[in-house]
Structures are given as structure tokens and as C-alpha cells.
């Protein structure tokens, strides 16, 4: 198995740092980033390690955007409900 170079390690560390930052980005930014990830993966120009890192980032962005959409859906349902004292509850995904 080939040994990882310091350049690939640097790439991994940069990606990990960027992934951590994704936790606080807006839905629109996350969706745009996800589209960029898909474009890079579909290009076929990434090394295996880069592709795996991008795939991992894409999964995290997908989970984040799905959670945001589900929270928005819950909010809309409550706003449209006939119950005047309905409250928003923290939303959790079953897979987390």
C-alpha cells in the first residue's frame, strides 16, 4: 500500500478543518458546497484519498441540509396547525 505524503496529510487536515466549519454555515451555503462536491467527484480528476474526503464532506453536508429542511418542515406544520399553543421541539435525526 502506498505511503501517504505530507501533501496528502495537509490536504486531509484542511478538509477536516473545513468540515468542522460546515456546522455553522447557512442552508444555501451548504447546498452550494454540496453541489461543488458532486461536481468534483463527477469530474474523475481526484485521487482516491481526495475522492473519499470529498465523499465524506458530501455526506456531512447532506445530513446538515436534510436536518435543516426537516426542521423547517416541522416549523411550517406547527404554524399551519390548529393548535394555538403548539411549541417547536428540538429536532433529532434517528440516525444520529
From Swiss-Prot:
It catalyses: Exonucleolytic cleavage in either 5'- to 3'- or 3'- to 5'-direction to yield nucleoside 5'-phosphates. One of its GO terms (cellular component) is cytosol. Belongs to the XseB family. NCBIfam families: PRK00977.1-1 (NF002137), PRK00977.1-4 (NF002140), xseB (TIGR01280). The keyword Hydrolase applies. GO terms for molecular function: exodeoxyribonuclease VII activity. Pfam families: Exonuc_VII_S. This is Exodeoxyribonuclease 7 small subunit.
